[in-house]
Amino acid sequence: MRSKPPSWGHEGIISRHPTKLLPIGLPGTGDLFAGSIVAGLARGVPLPRAVAIAQNLTSRAQDHANALGAGEVVLSEPESRRALVALDPN
């Protein structure tokens, strides 16, 4: 039996998570994205859901930083901080 290609995801399933492309690129977004996924997995959140939550939180953090004119991700918004702690984008 052939092994699965290394590009396959969790449980041998490729999952795609399209999102909007923002017109900005800020330092810290990759750290926030990866950290959110790892935190979700550590709490038992299934991988596809952890990715979706990470996308939502990262997008919101970028929007917030862009609105402030910041040059990096800003997590000072109380709503974002609560969502990060709870790993719930709503």
Swiss-Prot record:
GO terms for molecular function: catalytic activity. The keyword Transport does not apply. Involved in nodulation of a particular host, M.lupulina. This is Nodulation protein NolS. Keywords: Nodulation, Plasmid. It comes from the Bacteria.
